[in-house]
Amino acid sequence: MVVAAARELFCRHGYANVAMSDIATAVGIGPSALYRHFRGKQELLHAVTAEALESCLGGLTTAGRGDLDALLHEFAETSLARRELGVLWQREARNLPAEQRAELGEHLHAARRALAEQLTAARSELDHAHAELLAWSILDVAVSVSYQHVDLPAPDYPNLIADLMRRVATAELPDLGDHIADRPSTEQALEPRSRRESLLAAATRLFAERGYAAVTLEDTGTAVGIAGQSIYNHFASKHDILAAAMNRSAERLWLDLTEVLASVQDHADALRLLILRYARFALAHQHLVTLIVTETEHLQDDDRQRTLQTQRDYIDEWLHLVRAVHPAMSPAEARVRVQAVLTITNDIARTPRLRTRSGIEENVHRLGCSLLGLDDTAFVEGRTEVTPTVRSDR
């Protein structure tokens, strides 16, 4: 009962905004009684996240080799029954010590390995790199339901999620090479002369790596070689830095979208190019992507509402294109498909072992096209070229 109450509160309000007294009140006991079960909020978060991971992913690691389609359908149903997994793992588990996150992460790695084995058993032509990418992407489809707020009747919803997982599992992808230097190389890249821009870049990286709550102005100042108090010459507060970073990412995405719409006349071509441009943005700016996924809750009310509305408006542009290409598709189905594409792209961008492989941009693009029901003709920056691969299962 305590774990269930904590899970709901952490997902609804965010770990940083929930006190042990809030959890105690939710289960009708005093705070002192709660501390007899858990020594602190962090221990409770660990228990909540571990339980969610085991409940959602346990079936993958214990399943025997067999019907991949049936396994994916069962996983789709489980992911919908435990929709909190994505929020808990991607957003809230950042508040745990590194060793505990690594321990919990082994649940995901075990599930990924199990899925990769199932995929290679069903598709003997898959190499290790592609099997790993497809397995991670199937997990990301499951995680994406945490960020979906749609009303689909049963069995339509699990059938749709299972279909998306199946599209990933059967996708024929371009070459995926060895690991290359991370992008962009922070060790070799030139830095802006502007002190404000240097502070913004350093803070964005620190917020992404440690979480907003764990970073001080002194940390940011040290990263660029100035005293923490000097930051006030450029930003009024730590919150203003976060708001500036969020605004920077939003404006970049809208500029990309505007350029896409101005460069093509066909909705399908626009959607293909938008998938590519979003993948390019995410892979090059993984720290900004991390802030979008994990730190929005730390914005002050006005900035948070403005940021969320901007994100909703941006996604609505994707939905408009999807439904222009597929007029019979319901708004709810289009939203589920788009969220799956964005979640896969974001997670790959935030996962070094995937992000740093040569050819990853083209692979992400192909997966996105498959999930949105586009053919294998890749529209690339103003020209159409047919890639020499086998079609995805449609």
What are these regions (language model features)?
Residues 79-101, 282-302, 339-343:
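Amphipathic alpha-helical segments used for helix-helix packing
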Residues 122-187, 325-369, 379-384:
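Hydrophobic/aromatic-rich alpha-helical bundle segments in the mid-to-C-terminal region
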Residues 3-4, 16-17, 37-61, 196, ...:
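An amphipathic alpha-helix adjacent to DNA-recognition modules
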Residues 135-139, 227-228, 244, 270, ...:
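Extended non-catalytic domains of envelope/secretory-pathway proteins
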Residues 1, 5, 9-43, 206, ...:
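Helix-turn-helix
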